[in-house]
Amino acid sequence: MNTPMPSSTDDLIEALAEIEHEQWRHWSQAVAPKVGTGISDGWRKSWVNYAELTEELKEADRVWARKVFALLRERRLIE
């Protein structure tokens, strides 16, 4: 992932969402052999780069990105 430094809150949320998706993809691929094929088959369609996700799936990652953003702001690590 070669994301440029975010220049706004929205850019930061989007960058965090991309990282969240990458983390989920690595985790889900690692545990896929241990879960039922019905579950992992459903995940496979999301094993793509963040930019290739549907807006609905991107928004699911943004939900978690906003939680990280809120924590960073609460701890005064960002303004």
Per-range role (PLM):
Residues M1-E79:
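Alpha-helical propensity feature that highlights long, continuous alpha-helices across diverse contexts
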